[in-house]
Swiss-Prot record:
Active site annotation, chain numbering: 48
UniProt name for this protein: Bifunctional adenosylcobalamin biosynthesis protein CobP
Protein's gene: cobP
A single GO molecular function term of this UniProt record: GTP binding
EC number: 2.7.1.156, 2.7.7.62
Classification via InterPro entries: CobU/CobP, P-loop_NTPase
Complex formation: Homodimer.
Secretion signal, residue range per the UniProt entry: none
Function: Catalyzes ATP-dependent phosphorylation of adenosylcobinamide and addition of GMP to adenosylcobinamide phosphate.
Annotated organism of origin: Pseudomonas aeruginosa (strain ATCC 15692 / DSM 22644 / CIP 104116 / JCM 14847 / LMG 12228 / 1C / PRS 101 / PAO1)
Family: Belongs to the CobU/CobP family.
Catalytic activity from the UniProt record: adenosylcob(III)inamide + GTP = adenosylcob(III)inamide phosphate + GDP + H(+); adenosylcob(III)inamide + ATP = adenosylcob(III)inamide phosphate + ADP + H(+); adenosylcob(III)inamide phosphate + GTP + H(+) = adenosylcob(III)inamide-GDP + diphosphate
Entries under NCBIfam families matching the protein: PRK05800.1
Domain of life of the organism encoding this protein: Bacteria
Gene Ontology annotations of biological process type: cobalamin biosynthetic process
Length: 173
């Protein structure tokens, strides 16, 4: 089962993903893509860590997501990735278009092949106005294209608003 959970900042998407992982009854590997570039992000990361059960395996991978998924995925394991848009940001800031393209394609290729349960969390960025800056516009565009491609490969897609899951594809939660 592959789940994509979308939502805005502080929408409850991570809590929902963590709940689904815990309820799966499987061993959980939590793949964190965030990097603590400043104090505020460091506090967010600490908040997420504090919420996770101690027995969950945590891996921090800001760039090579597909390789990490391939190495961790197995029947009887749940992989929770939080989050795709931070991973995308990390790749955009690498300023290496070939790396971005390669990592994105590797992720899309491996999703259909992975055994076990996969839960992907991402920020929906396309509901606001078109950003003024070139990099910001590219980020919103890349996130939108990535979400479409991943949603196509997932059995269930859920949009989270105010802590409430709204089904977009597949069985409602």
């Amino acid at each position: 089962m592959r789940d994509l959970i979308l939502g805005g900042a502080r929408s409850g998407k991570s809590r929902l993903a963590e709940r689904l992982a815990a309820e799966s009854g499987l061993a959980v590997s939590y793949i964190a893509t965030a990097q603590a570039g400043d104090g505020e992000m460091g506090r967010r990361i600490a908040e997420h860590r504090a919420r996770r059960p101690a027995h969950w395996r945590t891996l921090e991978e800001p760039l090579a997501l597909a390789a990490t998924l391939r190495s961790e995925a197995e029947a009887g394991r749940c992989l929770l990735v939080d989050c795709l848009t931070l991973w995308l940001t990390n790749l955009l800031l690498c300023d290496d278009p070939q790396r971005l393209d390669g990592e994105r394609e590797a992720l899309l290729e491996c999703l259909g092949e992975l055994p076990g349960r996969i839960i992907l969390v991402s920020n929906e960025t396309g509901l606001g106005v078109v950003p003024l800056g070139e990099l910001s516009r590219r980020y919103v565009d890349e996130a939108g294209w990535l979400h479409q491609a991943i949603a196509e490969r997932c059995e269930r897609v859920t949009f989270t608003v105010a802590g409430l899951p709204m089904p977009l594809k597949g069985e409602p939660l």
